[in-house]
């Protein structure tokens, strides 16, 4: 936190930054760290935002973030299907809790941006429809939806091109998996498919 404080002081003083976004998907892993960062940010009269995980902070910690000037968070939910979140994404994030915490965060006058991806290996059309329903039933301020991309060096790329994963021996790319490498094009084709249902 001391380094971050001097860094932000430099950004706001020398470079006249008037807002900060912490693009760190481990920003709120642990209440103590998040609360210390909130203490640091309360020393600056600027709005700030952070990428967070929905289930790693207590409700009191979200309140401390809001009180210190946090105006919004980005939550990577990935899917509205519990099976996809648990078995495919391997995130083990309770979607009912996500809905509860999104509502809580919004009650603190913070925005919540939810991110979702479609077209994962093993994900069914029904899973994608569940995701659309989950988004509709949750109080996100904004959302981001994208198609899964096979980025070289990732486990997904290895799964598709080597047809196995040594670290996840049960992983398979089933015959329904769309092998489109461009996430944007994949998303467009999935949207058309979902609109027909």
Regions found by a protein language model. Name each.
Residues 1-9, 14-16:
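Acidic, low-complexity intrinsically disordered segments
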Residues 6, 26, 30-31, 36-197:
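A structural motif corresponding to the C-terminal lobe/cap of the Radical SAM core domain
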Residues 12-26:
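Active-site groove signature of glycoside hydrolases
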